[in-house]
Amino acid sequence: MTQSVVVQVGQCGNQIGCCFWDLALREHAAVNQKGIYDDAISSFFRNVDTRAVGDGGSISKGRISSLKARAVLIDMEEGVVNEILQGPLRDVFDSKQLITDISGSGNNWAVGHKVFGCLYREQILEKLRKSAEQCDCLQCFFIIHSMGGGTGSGLGTFLLKVLEDEFPEVYRFVTAVYPSSEDDVITSPYNSMLAMKELNEHADCVLPIDNQSLFDIISKIDLVVNSGKLGSAVKPKSLITSNMGAVKKHHKKPFDAMNNIVANLLLSLTSSARFEGSLNMDLNEISMNLVPFPKLHYLVSSLTPLYTLADVNIPPRRLDQMFSDAFSKDHQLIQADPRHSLYLACALIVRGNVQISDLRRNIERLKPALQFVSWNQEGWKTSLCSVPPVGHSHSLLALANNTCVKPTFMELRERFTRLYKKKAHLHHYLQVDGMEESTFTEAVSSLSALIQEYSDLDATKSLPVPDVPRLSVAL
């Protein structure tokens, strides 16, 4: 069994990470009721004997003693990390695997990347190495950060290059939260643009998340929960926005519900690596099957169902609806419509009581409405994990390498250009050692080249699919 390490950077990264670890513990507790440390739990947790001197000895088998997350927490302010260390999950994190500063990055990519990157490189590397040494078979680093702030975008993408240099064989999956057009950080277009160049060059897979899409999904769920319509009662533990197993009209913090959606995405993404199933998918297979070209590694994700109705049995029609929803624009985690764009490849990660025949039937049903590139007409990768998320009988995560991601990048470029034309706030960046104006122009060129690659693919959309010649055998 393989292990993964989560590196959560900045306020957003640490808040999502906290939700992820909370949900992961609940999920494993629901499955592993005997309290035995098994391969599934070891994928994200170490079992530590706290009675041992020093770091505590790792226990590979037997009963669970004290679980420690395979995580590195990084933030250049202390607030969020201190909050985590005083909260209910405080014992899950190893205090020696935290890096914090006091001053923060001031919503400036250059400070996070150039200043704190250089200042903390060796400390970060030491903690990454320690996490790697504690794994029997390290397969993947999951990096979680925002694109709009200074620490997440700057230091988050700095450590991506560190990981590439030091652990070239270990996959780098990035969950990057993109700011909405209403973002209150005025410099977020600069930060996002500069971070994009690093993601293009140093990530294996990027799962872009759009704050606006998360907000829209929450609004949609709230409409159902509060509608009071007959037959629309929602199972309390099935809300994709809830981590407390209870429906609450008001979350403790405005971003809690949004963060839980992203945490559920990560749980589903790793489900096959953690639990048994009739059709398992390794994490390396995602990159292998869904990324045909190195730079086109942005995967659009969707999650279904968003909730489960309490008073309805699940007939096949409802199961089929789950598959249909995964391709609708209302369920995408960025503002995108994959059905009207071009697929390079698509993965369906199914959990729970679903048969392979259900999977095949739905792919055949949906295929005519979806356009794939001519050279990858059968570009499907599927996974069936027998363990559903808590509160659901089944769920589906769809990952699409699809040209529908292009408008997100085009909007980012437009927002950047509006700011950059005025040279607004540019001096805050250029006064940082190592920053030059060419850093901005190179970042724009990098993103424009990426957009052009998607445009070139889109241009092939209306072309007929060539018949593949078959070999004739001479007898």
From Swiss-Prot:
Family annotation (PROSITE patterns): TUBULIN (PS00227)
Pfam family, one: Tubulin_C
Transmembrane feature ranges: none
Compartments reported by the entry: Cytoplasm, Cytoskeleton, Microtubule organizing center, Centrosome
MF annotations from Gene Ontology: GTP binding
Primary location: cytoplasm
Keyword line: Cytoplasm, Cytoskeleton, GTP-binding, Microtubule, Nucleotide-binding
One of the record's GO cellular component terms: centrosome
UniProt binding sites for GTP: 148-154
Keyword GTP-binding included in the entry's annotation: yes
Record bears the keyword GTP-binding: yes
GO biological process: microtubule-based process
InterPro entries membership: Epsilon_tubulin (IPR004057), Tub_FtsZ_C (IPR008280), Tubulin (IPR000217), Tubulin/FtsZ_2-layer-sand-dom (IPR018316), Tubulin/FtsZ_GTPase_sf (IPR036525), Tubulin_C (IPR023123), Tubulin_CS (IPR017975), Tubulin_FtsZ_GTPase (IPR003008)
CDD domains: epsilon_tubulin (cd02190)
Superkingdom as given in the UniProt entry: Eukaryota
Protein family: Belongs to the tubulin family.
Subunit structure: Found in a complex with TEDC1, TEDC2, TUBE1 and TUBD1.
Name of the protein in question: Tubulin epsilon chain
Organism, as annotated: Mus musculus (Mouse)
Gene: Tube1
